[in-house]
Each structure stands twice: as structure tokens, then as C-alpha cells.
Swiss-Prot record:
Region annotation Framework-3: where it falls in the sequence: 86-117
Name of the coding gene: Ighv1-72
Region annotation Framework-2: where it falls in the sequence: 55-68
Listed InterPro entries: Ig-like_dom (IPR007110), Ig-like_dom_sf (IPR036179), Ig-like_fold (IPR013783), Ig_V-set (IPR013106), IgHV (IPR050199)
The keyword Disulfide bond belongs to this UniProt entry's keyword annotation: yes
Protein name: Ig heavy chain V region 1-72
Amino acid sequence: MGWSCIMLFLAATATGVHSQVQLQQPGAELVKPGASVKLSCKASGYTFTSYWMHWVKQRPGRGLEWIGRIDPNSGGTKYNEKFKSKATLTVDKPSSTAYMQLSSLTSEDSAVYYCAR
């Protein structure tokens, strides 16, 4: 069997009228099937703990799928049932960074992932 990999593209979006609000994610990730990956989303320009952080998936040619959200203040999470065993959302308050860990990766996980305030 040949070596294969999974490509994850990362993007970010922020709502609101303040142009200084930024959500920064690194570029693409290349991982092996069965592995896990931790995606990051660093926020700036607003009070990180005042807004939920959402994560969304978009596969080529398909619509957006809401994965879940986390309250950076309390750490409380809510997940789309479909992603409960796939995604784990966490935050690091001191660095104003949200994380999403995806486990047991398959070709179905090859997508663009957005963090959104």
C-alpha cells in the first residue's frame, strides 16, 4: 500500500465592524491517515473571553458544516453531534488562542477549517 496523506486548509473569519479584530491561523497541514492534528486560532483586537469561538468545516464542492463552539471564559463547549467523537475544542486564555484537535483522521477530514468569532 502506498503512502497517503490528508491535507487540511485553515482559514479564519471575524464578525463585527472593528477592522482591528483579527483571527490568525497557520497555513495548511499535511498529516497521515489515522493521526491527529491540533489546529490553532489566535485572536487579537478584542476581549478574547467575551465571545464564543466557533469552528466550521468546508469540503470541496460542499456547504459549511458547524463543528462546535467554545466559551473562552468558562471553557464550556457545545458540539454538532456529528463531530463529538472527532473534534475537541480548547482555549488558552493567556495567549488568546483557541484550538481544535481532530483525531483519527481520514480522507473525509480533508477540508478547509474556519475559526469564527
